[in-house]
């Protein structure tokens, strides 16, 4: 090989290497077609289907346009109501809030799959465990059976989910085996999973399990129990003013503080009825709309993320 040919080969290799690096270094924002530095936000309502009060508040907020994404709890008593709404709003951004626990004292739910196929997931009464500490062992194979059952029921009732997430993060933050079970099911149904880089440090198996085509958000924000009720708007305003470039999801829990929701959640103040009313009030307020405009924050949905994952 002549010196000039060697030089050309080396230059070509360098160019190919640079090109490949650029592809892999491309941020999620760029994959979505936005300029680097753009602040993109998903305002995501959890727990739809749990009660009528949650469904009513969330759907009103979705119609107002400031809450623009949600996920549905298939095993819960009020899922049929929200499934009908999702079916009649096919352009809406509705994921499935994959559910394997039933944390309420008196307001309970259980698996979609037959109990005898998922015995490790239920208590002696056939409900999901209040907490997984109650179960001696959660069988990952049974988890997959139940996840498929929840997705299939949603599909049968006319819901076309845009993404998957996990109630109480049970499938995300309880080890690689369960996360991999969720990821296998997600890939089977060609659905993105809500995962954020914020979680990688504490749960390194997440990054190890994810492939190059999986969607990974940059940041997530959710309010914590130590925030006093009077400081609720301040917490969210500070978070929005300090929003970093990239794709962030605000995980919120809207609902109406009424007799139904107070009865369903009466054993706890965190994520209870008044908590959910505060979330609803802030995210439907003019104050929220104004700061979005002031900070040049653009709302996006999981539909856009799914298209990016497909390369469309």
Task: Report residues per predicted region.
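Catalytic domains of cell-wall/extracellular-matrix polysaccharide-remodeling enzymes
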Residues: 140, 144-232, 241, 281
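Active-site beta-loop-alpha junctions enriched in small/polar residues
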Residues: 48, 75, 97-103, 167-169, ...
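A short alpha/beta connector and helix-capping loop motif
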Residues: 53-77
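Acidic (Asp/Glu)-rich catalytic clusters
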Residues: 31-33, 58-64, 81-93, 110-123, ...
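Active-site gating loops and adjacent loop-to-helix segments of metal-dependent hydrolytic enzymes
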Residues: 109-134, 264-271
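C-terminal domain-boundary segment and adjacent tail
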Residues: 193-196, 268-312
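N-terminal pre-catalytic segment of deacetylase/amide-hydrolase enzymes
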Residues: 6-11, 21-42
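Structural preference for beta-strand elements that scaffold enzyme active sites
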Residues: 40-42, 67-71, 91-97, 161-165, ...
């Amino acid at each position: 090989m002549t010196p000039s040919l060697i030089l050309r080969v080396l230059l070509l290799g360098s160019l190919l290497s640079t090109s490949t690096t650029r592809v892999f270094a491309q941020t999620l924002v760029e994959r979505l077609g936005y300029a680097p530095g753009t602040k993109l936000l998903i305002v995501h309502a959890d727990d739809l289907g749990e009660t009528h009060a949650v469904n009513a508040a969330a759907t009103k907020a979705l119609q107002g346009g400031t809450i623009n994404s949600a996920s549905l709890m298939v095993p819960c008593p009020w899922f049929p109501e929200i499934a009908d709404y999702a079916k009649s709003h096919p352009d809406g951004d509705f994921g499935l809030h994959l559910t394997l626990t039933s944390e309420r004292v008196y307001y309970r739910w259980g698996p979609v799959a037959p109990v005898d196929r998922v015995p490790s997931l239920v208590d002696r009464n056939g409900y999901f465990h209040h907490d997984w500490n109650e179960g001696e062992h959660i069988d990952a194979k049974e988890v997959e059976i139940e996840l498929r059952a929840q997705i299939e029921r949603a599909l049968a009732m006319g819901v076309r989910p845009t993404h998957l997430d996990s109630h109480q993060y049970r499938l995300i933050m309880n080890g690689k085996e369960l996360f991999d079970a969720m990821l296998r099911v997600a890939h089977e149904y060609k659905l993105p999973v809500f995962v954020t880089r914020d979680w990688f440090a504490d749960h390194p198996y997440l990054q190890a399990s994810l492939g190059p085509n999986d969607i990974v958000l940059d940041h997530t924000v959710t309010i914590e129990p130590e925030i006093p009720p009077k400081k609720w708007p301040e917490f969210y305003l500070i978070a929005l003013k300090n929003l970093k470039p990239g794709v962030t999801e605000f995980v919120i829990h809207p609902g109406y503080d009424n007799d139904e929701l107070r009865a369903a959640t009466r054993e706890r103040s965190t994520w209870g009825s008044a908590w959910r009313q505060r979330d609803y009030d802030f995210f439907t307020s003019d104050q929220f709309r104004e700061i979005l405009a002031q900070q040049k924050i653009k709302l996006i949905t999981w539909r856009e993320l799914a298209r990016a994952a497909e390369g469309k």
